[in-house]
């Protein structure tokens, strides 16, 4: 069974994100557990934690259906020691927040070398950052998202994801999330069923489906292999609807959160309903 939803707002409290997901008739959702554009946030209170857990229970969302996202400020491959430390501390806080809320996944963008260190050195730092944080937490899997490769961001090649995983000691607590827009902008074709078959055969060969913990379902305003990250509504961009229909019919994508980050929240409910209908 597919878990399908969207990245919903947590404005007014994390429990409100659950309500918003339910209103969309979503079977999955993503959220930020704190303001994604700030380093620090007030600790989660017992009251907030309880409200979130009760809302999940009420609307029947299990941790397997929820894919929280970390702050955009974090760079686990930062070339500067002080900034790297700050990112690691912030990521540890994000993992702890997930643990407190009873969540088992945390999605994050791997990191950027900022033209100051080599790609290999940056990938090593990212793996080292994950090891440090996993050693200081329990029960939460670090989920690496592929990127479009804008600027000096790494993670746009499946080989980058494989290299990071290779450097992680506890492989039971590391996974990946594939964003369709990022993959397309990063040079992986998805414009036809045949292209999807080939792209995910490459994913299986280089990374492996055993590490797939989530998907971000986005069409692309950006051109193929442009290394530009611009999302679009399903069927409105350069990928087209065939890829999303194909994904819905492939059992390898069952049981993981599949999250819309498309550009028009007004049609999320319709997009979710369409995706559900394509499973047949």
Swiss-Prot record:
It comes from the Bacteria. Disulfide bonds: none annotated. Zn(2+) 2 binds at residues 145, 179, 216, 261. Zn(2+) 3 binds at residues 182, 229, 231. Zn(2+) 1 binds at residues 69, 109, 145. It catalyses: Endonucleolytic cleavage to 5'-phosphooligonucleotide end-products. One of its GO terms (biological process) is base-excision repair. It is an enzyme of class 3 (hydrolase). Binds 3 Zn(2+) ions. Endonuclease IV plays a role in DNA repair. It cleaves phosphodiester bonds at apurinic or apyrimidinic (AP) sites, generating a 3'-hydroxyl group and a 5'-terminal sugar phosphate. This is Probable endonuclease 4. The gene is nfo.
């Amino acid at each position: 069974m597919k878990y399908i939803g969207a990245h919903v707002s947590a404005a007014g409290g994390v429990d409100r994100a659950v309500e918003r997901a339910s209103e969309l008739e979503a079977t999955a959702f993503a959220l930020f557990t704190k303001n994604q554009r700030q380093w620090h946030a007030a600790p989660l209170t017992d009251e907030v934690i309880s409200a979130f857990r009760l809302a999940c229970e009420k609307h029947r969302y299990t941790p397997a259906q929820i894919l929280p996202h970390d702050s955009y400020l974090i760079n686990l491959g930062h070339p500067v020691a002080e900034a790297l430390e700050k990112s690691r501390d912030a990521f540890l806080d994000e993992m702890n927040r997930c643990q407190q809320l009873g969540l088992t996944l945390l999605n994050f963008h791997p990191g950027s070398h900022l033209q100051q260190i080599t790609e290999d050195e940056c990938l090593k730092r990212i793996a080292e950052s994950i090891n440090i944080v996993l050693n200081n937490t329990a029960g939460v899997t670090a989920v690496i998202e592929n990127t479009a490769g804008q600027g000096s961001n790494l993670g746009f090649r499946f080989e980058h994801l494989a290299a990071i995983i290779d450097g992680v000691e506890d492989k039971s607590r590391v996974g990946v999330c594939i964003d369709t827009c990022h993959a397309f902008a990063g040079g992986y074709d998805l414009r036809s069923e045949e292209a999807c078959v080939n792209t995910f055969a490459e994913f299986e060969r280089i990374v492996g489906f055993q590490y797939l913990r989530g998907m971000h379902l986005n069409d692309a305003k950006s051109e193929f292999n442009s290394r530009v990250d611009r999302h679009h509504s399903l069927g409105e961009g350069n990928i087209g609807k065939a890829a999303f229909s194909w994904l819905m019919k492939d059992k390898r994508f069952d049981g993981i959160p599949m999250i819309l980050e498309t550009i028009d929240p007004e049609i999320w409910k319709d997009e979710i309903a369409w995706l559900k209908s394509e499973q047949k």
